[in-house]
Structures are given as structure tokens and as C-alpha cells.
């Protein structure tokens, strides 16, 4: 059985996916071997951001230019991402975590099971407190849901209690967290969640 965990990170543009990868890499790299694949339609902006932040050594971060719909690149035709993941796994074997960040997409986004072992979906409070109840695979089926930027709730008139109630109803017992990734709130809990899903830690 493979000892690594492939983790998909998806969510709308600006929700905090790249910020999540930045904080997770900085938190986990002390104890684990990590690599990252990012997706952008026409650029490698997210990959370059992580490289410039020095969250990992440059070779461990690959930017994929999908040239089209972000959803297609992680679901229907994920060959570009699969090849990037395999390249990293061959180069840095053994790895513990391989993160695959989707380009910004809508609530219908989901990862191919051929590409990742589990998925994290990130939404943010600034989109309004109705987002959880709108559902979609990202809200209901992801292995972990993050509601980010909770510090903006008052500013945008979002009620966190409503978001909590709707999220618990839509998730039906699946895990989720409120986060403020700009100051690291929630990173410890997310890291523990991921560590518990490493194949070597499974009972």
C-alpha cells in the first residue's frame, strides 16, 4: 500500500486555496515530505507565489497550465495533473503529502478518484452566508470543508451561526472547520485531519 496521501484542494476564486497550501506546507514540512501541483488556466501564478514565499524548495512545486476549464483538468481529463504528480513522486520518493490545487471553480467542482485520495473544499464568508445551503459536490461530498475568512463576517453582513447550521445540515456529519488562514486559525485542526488520513496512520 502507498504511504503517501494525495490531497485535492478546490474552491471558488479568491476563497483561500493558495493561502491554505502556504500555511499547510509551512506547518507540515518540519515532519513530512511534501510536494504541490497548482492549476491555472494560462499562467503559473499560484505556483510562482508559493515558490517566492519559499514554502518548499522550488523543485517540489509544479504549476500546470490547463488552458481551459479548471473542472475538466481535475475530473474528466486529469492527465496533465496525473503526470505532474507522478513526476514529483518519482523525483522526491518517498513523499508523505502531494497537494493538487484546482484552478478557481464553482460549487460543482470535484476531483477524479484517479487523481486524489481525499479532497478539501474552500469557501469564504465574503461570498455570503447562503453559500453552504446552495450545496453542490464541493459543499456536500468533499472530505473536508473549510469556511474561510471568518474575520470578514461582520463586514459583509454574514451570520456565522446561520452558516454553521446550514453547513451541519448539508454535510451530514462530515468534518468542516471555520478558518481564518491569514492568521493561521484552523491550520492545526486541518493538519491533524490530514495526518490522521495518512495510510500509515490508518487502522
UniProtKB/Swiss-Prot annotation:
Q: Which domain of life is it from?
A: Bacteria
- Subunit record text: Homodimer. UreD, UreF and UreG form a complex that acts as a GTP-hydrolysis-dependent molecular chaperone, activating the urease apoprotein by helping to assemble the nickel containing metallocenter of UreC. The UreE protein probably delivers the nickel.
Q: Could you tell me the Gene Ontology terms of the biological process aspect for this record?
A: urea catabolic process
By its UniProt entry, which Gene3D superfamilies does this protein fall under? Answer: P-loop containing nucleotide triphosphate hydrolases
GO cellular component, as recorded: cytoplasm
Question: What protein family does this chain belong to?
Answer: Belongs to the SIMIBI class G3E GTPase family. UreG subfamily.
Q: InterPro entries of this UniProt entry? A: CobW/HypB/UreG_nucleotide-bd (IPR003495), P-loop_NTPase (IPR027417), UreG (IPR004400)
Q: Tell me what gene encodes this.
A: ureG
Q: Molecular function (GO) terms listed? A: GTP binding; GTPase activity; nickel cation binding
Identify the residues that bind GTP.
11-18
List locations, semicolon-separated: Cytoplasm
**Does Cytoplasm appear among the keywords?**
yes
Role, per record: Facilitates the functional incorporation of the urease nickel metallocenter. This process requires GTP hydrolysis, probably effectuated by UreG.
Asked if the keyword RNA-binding belongs to this entry, the reply reads: no
Q: What is this protein called?
A: Urease accessory protein UreG
Could you list this entry's UniProt keywords, alphabetically sorted: Chaperone, Cytoplasm, GTP-binding, Nickel insertion, Nucleotide-binding
User: Which PANTHER family is this protein grouped with?
Assistant: UREASE ACCESSORY PROTEIN G (PTHR31715:SF0)
**What does the record give as the organism's lineage?**
Bacteria, Bacillati, Cyanobacteriota, Cyanophyceae, Synechococcales
